[in-house]
A protein has these predicted regions:
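Bacterial N-terminal signal peptides
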Residues: 16-30
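Boundary at the C-terminal end of the N-terminal hydrophobic targeting segment
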Residues: 31-38
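Active-site-proximal helix/loop segments of hydrolytic enzymes
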Residues: 38-39, 65-250
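Short glycine-rich His-centered loop
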Residues: 39-59
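Acidic active-site catalytic centers that drive phospho-/nucleotidyl reactions
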Residues: 44, 62, 215
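Short, flexible micro-motifs
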Residues: 49, 56, 62, 114, ...
Length: 250
């Protein structure tokens, strides 16, 4: 049997609890909505273990650089309350179209890579008893968007914002991809911020959401590779990428 509490009407007491519960639920929902207001940011780890991309000047596969930087970008996004999705981190995703499909529903797809240069521009050297290929001629980051992506204009805004944030943080765009002779003649979408058009790039054109590809630096460049492998530098790059995303996806 319920024991009445002196001075309190039972139905009013129950109603108060119900109202309080509803208030808590509403506040929780509002907080959750605020965190996810910018939508999910999908971060694609470029390449996979069986085809790990370019080999760095010191013999490390690109996939490992991509995985480490993507994880740092995700961690910093989450630290700012952003919802994230990491794609391909296990190194088993061998289908390019599967990557944007995995990101379905995300607000933005960022594919993380590290750069090389044309084979004819590379030289040979020996490191730890193994002959390696390197090229010290170019360094710096680059960004790419595809006009075959339905959200390419937003993708371009985000790429430009990321490029601007990287420059503000002290990094330099490579720019050589636009050169007819030493690059691939990739037209500039935003030269100042190191953004190029790459319309046929599969991971971008197959995406249903705004998408961009980020080349963090040139790992066949012996000096730049050392910098890109430094956790402190990686943290600075990730912070700049996140600042750019925050600018274009408020």
């Amino acid at each position: 049997m319920a024991v009445p509490i002196r001075g309190v009407r039972p139905m009013r007491w129950v109603g108060s609890l119900v109202a309080e519960g509803l208030l808590v639920a509403l506040l929780t929902a509002a907080a959750t909505s605020a965190v996810a207001a910018g939508g999910v940011i999908a971060i694609d780890v470029g390449h996979y273990r069986e085809a790990p991309g370019v080999t760095s000047a010191h013999g490390r596969p690109e996939f490992e650089f991509n995985r480490d930087l993507a994880a740092e970008i995700e961690a910093q996004l989450q630290a700012r309350g952003r919802s994230t999705q990491l794609i391909g981190a296990a190194g088993e995703m061998n289908s390019l179209p599967a990557r944007p499909r995995a990101a379905a529903g995300a607000a933005l797809l960022v594919s993380v890579h590290h750069d090389s240069m044309q084979a004819r521009l590379l030289s040979s050297w020996t490191y730890e008893g193994v002959e390696r290929r390197y090229g010290d001629r170019f360094a710096g980051f680059s960004l790419f968007v595809s006009r075959e992506n339905p959200g390419w204009r937003r993708g371009l805004r985000c790429a430009s914002a990321i490029g601007a944030a990287l420059i503000h943080a002290g990094f330099t765009p490579s720019l050589y991809h636009a050169d007819r002779k030493v690059g691939e003649n990739r037209a500039f979408a935003d030269k100042r911020n190191g953004v190029h058009y790459f319309d046929r790039l599969a991971v971008l054109r197959h995406a249903s959401m705004p998408a961009l590809l980020f080349e963090a630096g040139v790992i066949v460049n012996r000096e730049e590779e050392k910098q890109l492998a430094d956790p402190a530098v990686r943290g600075r790059i990730a912070a700049a990428v996140v600042n750019g995303i925050e600018e274009c996806m408020p």
